[in-house]
UniProtKB/Swiss-Prot annotation:
<dbReference type="GO" id="GO:0051287">
    <property type="term" value="F:NAD binding"/>
</dbReference>
<keyword id="KW-0618">Plastoquinone</keyword>
<dbReference type="InterPro" id="IPR014029">
    <property type="entry name" value="NADH_UbQ_OxRdtase_49kDa_CS"/>
</dbReference>
<dbReference type="InterPro" id="IPR022885">
    <property type="entry name" value="NDH1_su_D/H"/>
</dbReference>
<dbReference type="GO" id="GO:0019684">
    <property type="term" value="P:photosynthesis, light reaction"/>
</dbReference>
<comment type="function">
    <text>NDH shuttles electrons from NAD(P)H:plastoquinone, via FMN and iron-sulfur (Fe-S) centers, to quinones in the photosynthetic chain and possibly in a chloroplast respiratory chain. The immediate electron acceptor for the enzyme in this species is believed to be plastoquinone. Couples the redox reaction to proton translocation, and thus conserves the redox energy in a proton gradient.</text>
</comment>
<keyword id="KW-0521">NADP</keyword>
<dbReference type="InterPro" id="IPR029014">
    <property type="entry name" value="NiFe-Hase_large"/>
</dbReference>
<keyword id="KW-0520">NAD</keyword>
<keyword id="KW-0934">Plastid</keyword>
<keyword id="KW-0793">Thylakoid</keyword>
<protein>
    <recommendedName>
        <fullName>NAD(P)H-quinone oxidoreductase subunit H, chloroplastic</fullName>
        <ecNumber>7.1.1.-</ecNumber>
    </recommendedName>
</protein>
<comment type="similarity">
    <text>Belongs to the complex I 49 kDa subunit family.</text>
</comment>
<keyword id="KW-0150">Chloroplast</keyword>
<keyword id="KW-1278">Translocase</keyword>
<keyword id="KW-0874">Quinone</keyword>
<comment type="subunit">
    <text>NDH is composed of at least 16 different subunits, 5 of which are encoded in the nucleus.</text>
</comment>
Length: 393
């Protein structure tokens, strides 16, 4: 009888791009020695759609529907960064009521994004129940979005100088009811997950990142704050009206997957505090800056020609971008979402560079999974929280 010999060669395995734990079309080429990970090489680009080049051939208004396809789980943030850039270029003031509405929508979108991170993350490490629970609260948020914007996901709600429409009658009361209900929902999650011994075994001490490493790799968002760095752009950049509310930056010092989970869970509670304060203090007044219309660039006279009278499509408003450059950023659920914009005295941007948080945060993955077990890849990748739409752009 021949005794089978032990395999001595390293094994190279493809994970993705169809694997359910890849959270999109991410492909990992993993080198294994048994169950131990020797090397990991991420392969990107399966969802590349040329979003930056499209922006250079569209006006800002025409481009707004495209941006919701970057991070399609936190679309309010991509819309916010898109309108913030021309607002700063043109020195356009946003009415106070519009700013409050923006904050409410941004924080609701942050909660929805964190919820849809939590469910699949728990499913990746073997806990299926929270995956079904999170859809209850997420559905309530989408009902609020649908009532205010008309769309559940791709909202197209933000406008240069304000928002597309005011909040409908009864919406504020409905949102306050949701906030009261959601506080009990977060408590339920913490009872179900946070002290679960099997969950702690899978995440505690896995994927450790020190504060120095987080800064050197350019990490942001919960990835940075879970490593002991108290950095939140809502506090640092003072954009919109976040300074008017009482809330705290959530952070942990352990730097592992458990710390990143705790940061996101606590951030949802802080978002509820911000929303409740904004709903109670929301001022009256206009929801858009009517002066923005003077920035509209007059169409060429050919639009009045006979041939164009039968075109039913109304020309979209355009805004001339002055000849300067700037970088704007917001604190998205996954980290720092930024845009580097160069104007050229034209209605089209000369350059529109997107700084997606997921792409930067994903760079540290090969270092985190080395010398770990194969099963830990799902835990570490899930704790990073990526959406391939913004990674590949």
């Amino acid at each position: 009888m021949t005794v089978p010999t032990t395999r001595k060669d390293l094994m190279i395995v493809n994970m993705g791009p169809q694997h359910p734990s890849m959270h999109g079309v991410l492909r990992l080429i993993v080198t294994l020695d048994g169950e131990d990970v020797i090397d990991c090489e991420p392969i990107l680009g399966y969802l590349h759609r040329g979003m930056e080049k499209i922006a250079e051939n569209r006006t800002i208004i025409q481009y707004l529907p495209y941006v919701t396809r970057w991070d399609y789980l936190a679309t309010m943030f991509t819309e916010a960064i898109t309108v913030n850039a021309p607002e700063q270029l043109g020195n356009i003031q946003v009415p106070k009521r519009a700013s409050y509405i923006r904050v409410i929508m941004l924080e609701l979108s942050r909660i929805a994004s964190h919820l849809l991170w939590l469910g699949p993350f728990m499913a990746d490490i073997g806990a299926q129940t929270p995956f079904f629970y999170i859809f209850r609260e997420r559905e309530l948020i989408y009902d609020l979005f649908e009532a205010a914007t008309g769309m559940r996901m791709m909202h197209n709600y933000f406008r240069i100088g304000g928002v597309a429409a005011d909040l409908p009658h009864g919406w504020i009361d409905k949102c306050l009811d949701f906030c009261d209900y959601f506080v009990t929902g977060v408590t339920e999650y913490q009872k179900l997950i946070t002290r679960n011994p099997i969950f702690l075994e899978r995440v505690e001490g896995v994927g450790f990142i020190s504060g120095e490493e987080a800064i050197n790799w350019g990490l942001s968002g919960p990835m940075l704050r879970a490593s002991g760095i108290q950095w939140d752009l809502r506090k640092v950049d003072h954009y919109e009206c976040y300074d008017e509310f009482d809330w705290e930056v959530q952070w942990q010092k352990e730097g592992d997957s458990l710390a990143r989970y705790l940061v996101r869970i606590n951030e949802m509670t802080e978002s509820i505090k911000i929303i409740q304060q904004a709903l109670e203090r929301i001022p009256g007044g206009p929801y858009e800056n009517l002066e923005v219309r003077r920035f509209d660039r007059t169409r060429d006279s050919e639009w009045n020609d006979f041939d164009y009278r039968f075109i039913s499509k109304k020309p979209s408003p355009t805004f001339e971008l002055s000849k300067q450059e700037l970088y704007v950023r917001v604190e998205a659920p996954k980290g720092e979402l930024g845009i580097f914009l160069i104007g050229d005295q034209s209605v089209f941007p000369w350059r529109w560079k997107i700084r997606p948080p997921g792409f930067i945060n994903l760079q540290i993955l090969p270092q985190l999974v080395k010398r770990m077990k194969l099963a830990d890849i799902m835990t570490i990748l899930g704790s990073i929280d990526i959406i391939m739409g913004e990674v590949d752009r």
